[in-house]
Amino acid sequence: MTMKKIFILLAMTFLSTGLFAQKFPGLARTPQMGWNTWNKFQGNINEKLIKETADKMVELGIVDAGYVYLNIDDCWHGQRDANGFITENKEKFPSGMKALGEYIHSKGMKFGIYSDAGRQTCACFPGSSGHEFQDALVYARWGVDYLKYDWCNSKDLNSKGAYSLMRDALYAAGRPVLFSICEWGSTKPWLWASEVGHSWRTTGDISPAFNVGVNYGDWTALSVLDILDKQDTLRKYAGPGHWNDPDMLEVGNGMSVNEDRAHFTMWCMLAAPLILGNDLTNISKETLDIITNRAMIAVDQDTLGIQGLKYRDDGDIEYWFKPLSNGDWAMTVLNRGEKPFNCTINWKDFDFTDKLSGRSTCFGSQVYSYKNLWAPVPANAKAAKTSAKTAAKTLTSSPLSVVIPSHDVLALRLTPKATKK
């Protein structure tokens, strides 16, 4: 009997006992943060790029800001060996994945990798279908901490079954792995994936476009606003250990500074995984300031783990709230329009109870202090500088008037103060 057949028999035995029918607990108690190769580099990846990126993540303070996963997406694969075990592309990764994982770990980071539930990946490299337990064992030997698992070339597969099988394989291999389900929302994974993975994609792929998607002929990549519009009804499914994933960040990949700031802010309001996808070896100060904004990241990483809600939609202007720990709230006003918006907030107009969390804003009886989470803002956003000065830190006992530039946000953190007498 070949080694492959022995391994498959062992895997079937494990499954029949039900010993591995769970994901790893304790992971992703807040949304995962890291960097991924795909959005910027796609298949143009190699060992040198990964090591340089790891070095930059440490040097620039990106790891200290919370981005601990360095994830290699599609196109790392070689072929399967004679026993069916996956290998890396030795031309791209001459030292091997195990050595590369050790390098990433030496930087205080975690190592992520990619595969696909189908026979082939999206770029037509070997997928994991029929080799789930073998691949999981290889990943464990390489020291992998994160698996993004795609859904290309998956015709005739049952999504829940296919993802559950890889979940069980990862658990059987014995190394804790954050399992990122990339099924594009096609079979409503929010209804079944909380016991299978730690996050699940809710839509198709994102593009570096704020309000109009990018057409690639037989498919269209979605804009930031396209994806945002699909998230509000899904908030009840998210929470510690199981997150809605609106796809990786496009900050630094060609949108304006205002649009990058709005994109990052809204993903934080959604309690979304924050997975960077830009070139960290050639990053602007404006982009670095956005992705390392500790105050905004704290909104995303709040341990209460509640996804924000769109409270009011006035067309081009949206008002979002997110309950935070210790009675705090995050509030974001998003200007989707093409012109600056003169915004006046009369706080009592936003007195409501969030049914999901049971929390009430109580602006009629509770005074909050608030601070602008983007103060100071980049120097090229002249209108926003006035906003930052106006809303630096004050109380909700008086209205707030600010100017929000086109495709930009006002983001506030509200902290309760003494109750009115």
Segments predicted by a language model, with ranges:
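Carbohydrate-binding surface patches
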Residues: W267-L270, I275-G277, D313-D354, H407
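C-terminal beta-strand-rich structural cap/linker in extracellular carbohydrate-active enzymes
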Residues: K389-K421
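Structural recognition of the beta-strand scaffold that forms the well-ordered cores
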Residues: L27, P31-T37, G66-I72, K110-S115, ...
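N-terminal module-boundary/linker segments of secreted carbohydrate-active enzymes
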Residues: Q22-K51, K56
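Catalytic cores of secreted or luminal carbohydrate-active enzymes
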Residues: R261-Y311
